[in-house]
């Protein structure tokens, strides 16, 4: 860390050098291929590695200040370790630190110093100084020891020190909590995507220099181990990690460092991405997860290198980034190719063109050219690729200068020039970066590393960036998207991006517009690339939420959107409020984006974001994203959608192959991957998206409740803590009873998304609503890692109540509880209105957008269309709380629409507002309930007309005497009578269906238990995935059946031939099931059979029943699939 810090402070040149070294190290560590790619890298490898290792080993605390002292702790069992602490901390804090390091309860530890037990006071009081030796002896209790009670969240939090809490709240490092619930442990990793500018900057810069810390910020989740990798990836990983947002990060980080994939850098990256994507639930799973998440993640590994190769020196950086970005561990051998592809993807993601070019094979030169053409690209390339997610971009941006320098050194002056030329481009990039991790922030803050870049960016973005960074930046993830976007937009779809941007709303923000124009200008070449990008992109998309969006975008307007993102990010920085929405966008960071978001929706931009976030952004974006997908990728659409899914999931992994293959194939692959990643995918997408979102939200996970409650309020805190403990218990029970809900519990990645969906849903302000809808954003990426390890990612936006006036999370441990609480509460099951749903656009394209959740479910699209006047439908759903006529009628419409949608294909099923309903039914129900009490509270007696309108032409008359909500009906018109009867029947049917579903679920669970684990799991996952993929095309009613059947089918025929195209899934629920499952299987073959199968299966059911499928079911499936 110190080294890294030193590096940071070093001169720009030195820093670049360092960055190069880091990159090299990363490369070296992560991917051997990289080494060859760049000589300079190689030399540096050693020190960069060193730094990485240091980083990996040191904890965030170490990063702390130079004022720390090192204490040598020797245990009675012979293990020795050192801790670096500040001399003024209390003995209790030291015990907490040690307890956390050893993962034991602090009351079980006894510290002796000079034969004296340390009990209270500060370290200074006991004359502890640098190098002091402390003997650690365990407290042993004799006698009958009752089963230790479950740890409460409070106890878990007590073991945290202020530095950890502050680092978490500032987005620097993820917060890891371990809780014991009955006989199993739950590891929770929370990551805020937000970083304060300093942090953000650090993230990028650090990555460059030491990489660890900066990345860490970005990656946050990936912080320690990931971080190291990150540095290599420099921004990439970071981005990913950011994306990871946390859960995955943890595991991923470890894995990454280890090089879970063989390539350490890559691994890390992958872990980070994977983390991002899914948030690995446990560390071990995390690695897996990460790879699964990003199945492609694996690819990424190889990728990384490969990427580098293609670009040559540029690639080198590229590779790094890429690799990181990819962070996949994709096969190493594959790696090369994949690399390429991935690279492209990333690139493309980043800069389509460049990616594409790279993809082509002539990639190197192309890339170079592209780079030249697209500074952004180059930046991206340098780091975007790494991140592949956007983050990389940001990294790249951050690194941009370094990159540039490297590249320049390498002979890619073009890039540099472009960078220089394209201030805007740089700007955008930084913005993206900012999003990404605050790279902008860093540059802004710390110019030396990226002087040139920062100069480019600094003026316009400086503020924004900083601002962004704090909130948006946090959007690292987001930003990654942003980054991606920005780069990607430019590169990937420069043309698109410009067009999109312009149309989309880039223009809305001047900065965005500028960025866009820069991007556009910058990426003229890419215009050609887009298709390729598209092709490839989907995979990348999968790879990283953000990336994916770019990739998608390129197809259509993604990049525009992305660009918008980037721009947005920048702007957004200023607006905290948008965080929820922002989340949606990759650039969720951008405050602005939020608004834009909506815009984009319309534009189709969303889709880019959507993808990335598809799940995550879940609602707003997702719905838009679905649209987007639709629009934007009309041609590629299917693949895109799939990609979106996959992307989130891990299409990347398939991406390489798929990239080469046709889009549809890729799509399938992706799907498969998704499936593999499935939980991951959905989760991933979500996760990544989520992450991104979260990033945007400064404290991504605040819960509406929190917002409602005064954070400082002790009573609230106690309650929040209790709720949280209960929720966790529920989660863990569910997980272990095969009903994993999102949580899987294993990891609760920050709950950014949770809010985010809501926000996106438009209820940006009403925390409650957002939360509700936001839960939709919850990513359900639960995977089951072997024996009882599950991971789930939740994300949401930070509740405004938890933010200080700069939009940063309040510095207080209680904030953590509230964040966690909201996160979890937002999950569909627990959250009042939460819904996870992947909703298909009306067109029926199956996009990963699923975001019914944000949108509130039932038809997110619908809902957005109808535009509840309350941003969140979910609120509407609970008509009890809120029955205004407007809402009611809206609800009605909505419900109708949603029904049609659902049945139509549009199926936007949402994960029910009401726990186990399809949203449409829920909506119906809600509306019916409101209707039946149609005289809503808000209506006054004299408002029969409004009543009428509300009931769609009902002519009932009410007496006016009754001032309360329930007016007596004087005369009920026929229409209402019929309606009421229908309602009743419908609700009865729904209930029946629900009961049946539950029975069926139980049966399935039993079957799954008896069957071989993998198959069952995959089937399940597939199930949910396919439904998701299907986008709820099937009629809602069919949904449940479809889902189930899908599951059974899957179980029965896990490896159907892949003859059926994925599209089928989209097209018809039944088909989709079959087709999907077969696809999934196919995919599975390619990458993770079970997972894939799961995915496809999942896709099919989801398609049909997203709304119907109970959250558990889906989650369960996901887990299993994973």
Curated annotation (Swiss-Prot):
One of the Pfam families matching this protein, by short name? ubiquitin
Q: What is this protein called?
A: Midnolin homolog
Question: Any idea which UniProt keywords this protein has?
Answer: Nucleus
Record-level GO BP terms: proteasomal ubiquitin-independent protein catabolic process
Where are the residues of the annotated region Required for interaction with Pc? 210-300
Phenotype caused by lack of the gene: Homozygous and hemizygous lethal at the pupal stage. Hemizygous escapers display haltere-to-wing and metathoracic-to-mesothoracic leg transformations and die as pharate adults.
Q: An example Gene Ontology cellular component term from the record?
A: nucleoplasm
- Role played: Facilitates ubiquitin-independent proteasomal degradation of polycomb protein Pc by interacting directly with the proteasome and recruiting Pc to it.
Q: For the Ubiquitin-like domain, which residue ranges apply?
A: 69-143
| SUPFAM superfamilies in the record | Ubiquitin-like
Subunit structure of this chain's protein = Interacts with PRC1 complex member polycomb protein Pc; the interaction targets Pc for ubiquitin-independent proteasomal degradation. Does not interact with PRC1 members Ph, Psc or Sce so does not appear to be a member of the PRC1 complex. Interacts with 26S proteasome regulatory subunit Rpn10.
- Cite the record's Polar residues compositional bias ranges: 937-954, 1071-1085
Misc note:
The name 'stuxnet' derives from a computer (PC) virus of the same name, due to the role of the protein in promoting Pc protein degradation in the proteasome.
Comp. bias (Low complexity): 266-298, 375-397, 612-627, 648-663, 746-766, 856-867, 889-903, 922-936, 1086-1107
Localisation per UniProt entry: Nucleus
* Basic residues composition-biased segments: 300-310, 321-352, 596-610
**Main subcellular location:** nucleus
**Domain note for this entry?**
The ubiquitin-like domain is required for Pc degradation.
The UniProt entry, under SMART domains, shows: UBQ (SM00213)
Residue segments, region Disordered: 257-399, 596-630, 645-677, 746-775, 840-876, 886-905, 922-955, 1067-1122
């Amino acid at each position: 860390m110190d080294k890294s810090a030193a590096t940071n402070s070093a001169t720009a040149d030195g820093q670049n050098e360092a960055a190069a070294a880091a990159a090299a190290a990363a490369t070296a560590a992560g991917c051997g291929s990289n080494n060859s790619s760049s000589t300079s890298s190689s030399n540096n490898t050693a020190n960069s590695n060193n730094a990485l290792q240091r980083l990996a080993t040191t904890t965030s605390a170490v990063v702390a200040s130079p004022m720390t002292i090192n204490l040598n702790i020797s245990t009675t069992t012979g293990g020795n370790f050192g801790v670096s602490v500040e001399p003024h901390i209390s003995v209790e804090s030291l015990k907490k630190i040690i307890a956390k390091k050893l993962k034991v309860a602090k009351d079980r530890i006894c510290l002796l110093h000079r034969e004296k037990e340390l009990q209270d006071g500060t370290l200074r009081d006991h004359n502890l100084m640098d190098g002091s030796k402390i003997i650690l002896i365990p407290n042993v209790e004799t006698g009958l020891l009752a089963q230790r009670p479950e740890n409460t969240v409070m106890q878990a939090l007590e073991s945290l020190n202020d530095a950890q809490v502050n680092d978490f709240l500032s987005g620097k490092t993820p917060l890891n909590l371990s809780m014991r619930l009955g006989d199993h442990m739950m590891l929770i990793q929370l990551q805020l995507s937000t970083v304060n500018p300093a942090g953000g900057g650090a993230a990028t810069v650090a990555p460059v220099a030491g990489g660890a810390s900066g990345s860490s910020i970005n990656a946050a989740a990936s912080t320690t181990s990931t971080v190291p990798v990150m540095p290599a990836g420099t921004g990439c990983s970071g981005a990913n990690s950011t994306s990871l947002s946390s859960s995955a990060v943890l595991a991923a980080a470890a894995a990454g460092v280890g090089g879970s994939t063989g390539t350490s850098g890559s691994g890390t990256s992958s872990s980070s991405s994977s983390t991002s994507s899914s948030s690995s639930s446990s560390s071990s799973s995390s690695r897996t997860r990460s790879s699964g998440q990003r199945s492609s993640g694996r690819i990424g590994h190889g990728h990384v290198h490969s990427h580098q190769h293609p670009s040559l020196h540029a690639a080198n950086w590229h590779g790094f980034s890429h690799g990181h970005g990819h962070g996949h561990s994709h096969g190493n051998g594959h790696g090369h190719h994949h690399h390429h592809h991935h690279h492209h993807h990333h690139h493309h993601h980043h800069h389509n063109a460049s990616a594409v070019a790279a993809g082509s094979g002539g990639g190197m030169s192309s890339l170079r050219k592209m780079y030249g053409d697209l500074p952004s690209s180059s930046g991206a390339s340098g780091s975007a690729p790494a991140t592949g997610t956007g983050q990389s971009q940001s990294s790249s941006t951050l690194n941009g200068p370094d990159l540039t320098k490297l590249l320049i050194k390498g002979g890619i002056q073009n890039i540099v020039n472009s960078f220089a030329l394209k201030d805007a481009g740089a700007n955008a990039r930084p913005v993206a970066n900012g999003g990404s991790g605050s790279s902008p922030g860093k540059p802004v803050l710390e110019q030396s590393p990226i002087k040139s870049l920062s100069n480019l960016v600094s003026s316009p973005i400086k503020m924004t960036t900083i601002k962004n960074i704090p909130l948006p930046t946090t959007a690292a993830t987001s930003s990654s998207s942003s980054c991606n976007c920005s780069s990607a937009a430019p590169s990937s779809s420069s043309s698109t991006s410009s067009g999109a941007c312009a149309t989309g709303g880039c223009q809305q923000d001047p900065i965005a517009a500028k960025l866009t124009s820069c991007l556009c200008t910058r990426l003229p070449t890419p215009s050609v690339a887009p298709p390729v990008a598209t092709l490839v992109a989907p995979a990348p998309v999968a790879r990283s939420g953000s990336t994916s969006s770019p990739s998608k975008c390129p197809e259509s307007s993604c990049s525009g959107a992305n660009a918008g993102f980037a721009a947005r990010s920048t702007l957004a920085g200023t607006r905290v409020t948008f965080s929820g929405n922002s989340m949606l966008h990759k650039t969720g960071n951008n405050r602005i984006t939020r608004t834009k978001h909506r815009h984009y929706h319309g534009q189709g931009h969303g889709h880019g974001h959507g993808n990335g976030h598809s799940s995550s952004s879940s609602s707003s974006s997702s719905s838009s994203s679905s649209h987007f997908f639709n629009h934007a990728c009309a041609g590629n659409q299917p693949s895109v959608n799939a990609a979106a899914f996959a992307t989130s999931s891990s299409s990347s992994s398939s991406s390489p192959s798929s990239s080469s293959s046709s889009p549809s194939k890729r799509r399938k692959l992706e799907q498969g991957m998704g499936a593999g990643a499935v939980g991951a995918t959905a989760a991933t997408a979500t996760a990544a998206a989520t992450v991104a979102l979260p990033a945007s939200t400064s404290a991504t996970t605040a819960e509406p409740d929190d917002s409602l409650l005064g954070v400082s309020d002790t009573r609230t805190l106690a309650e929040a803590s209790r709720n949280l403990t209960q929720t966790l218990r529920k989660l863990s029970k569910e997980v272990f009873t095969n009903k994993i809900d999102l949580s899987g519990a294993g990891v609760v990645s920050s709950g950014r998304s949770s809010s985010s969906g809501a926000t996106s849903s438009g209820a940006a302000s009403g925390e409650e609503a957002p939360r509700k809808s936001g839960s939709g954003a919850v990513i359900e990426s639960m995977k089951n890692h072997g024996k009882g390890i599950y991971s789930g990612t939740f994300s949401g936006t930070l509740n405004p109540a938890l933010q200080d006036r700069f939009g940063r999370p309040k510095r207080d441990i209680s904030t953590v509880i509230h964040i966690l609480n909201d996160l979890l509460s937002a999950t569909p099951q627990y959250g009042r209105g939460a819904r996870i749903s992947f909703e298909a656009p009306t067109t029926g394209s199956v996009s990963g957008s699923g975001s019914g959740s944000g949108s509130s479910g039932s038809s997110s699209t619908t809902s957005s269309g109808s535009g509840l006047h309350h941003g969140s439908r979910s609120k509407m759903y609970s008509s009890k709380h809120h029955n205004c006529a407007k809402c009611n009628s809206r609800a009605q419409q909505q419900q109708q629409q949603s029904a049609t949608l659902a049945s139509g294909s549009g199926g936007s099923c949402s994960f029910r507002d009401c726990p186990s309903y399809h949203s449409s039914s829920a909506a119906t129900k809600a509306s019916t309930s409101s209707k039946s009490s149609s005289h809503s509270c808000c209506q006054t007696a004299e408002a029969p007309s409004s009543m009428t309108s509300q009931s769609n032409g009902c002519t009932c008359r009410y007496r006016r005497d009754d001032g309360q909500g329930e007016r007596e009906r004087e005369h009920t018109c026929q229409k209402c009578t019929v309606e009421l009867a229908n309602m009743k029947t419908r609700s009865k049917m729904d209930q029946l269906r629900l009961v049946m579903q539950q029975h069926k679920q139980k049966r399935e669970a039993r079957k799954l238990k008896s069957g071989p684990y993998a198959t069952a799991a995959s089937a399940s996952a597939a199930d949910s995935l396919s439904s998701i993929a299907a986008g709820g095309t099937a009629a809602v009613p069919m949904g449940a059946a479809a889902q189930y059947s899908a599951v059974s089918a899957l179980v029965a025929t896990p490896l159907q031939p892949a003859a059926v195209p994925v599209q089928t899934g989209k097209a018809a629920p039944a088909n989709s099931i079959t087709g999907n499952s077969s696809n999934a299987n196919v995919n599975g073959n390619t990458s993770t059979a079970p997972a894939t199968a799961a995915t496809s299966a999942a896709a099919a059911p989801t398609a049909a029943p997203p709304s119907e499928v109970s959250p558990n079911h889906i989650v369960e499936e996901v887990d299993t699939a994973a």
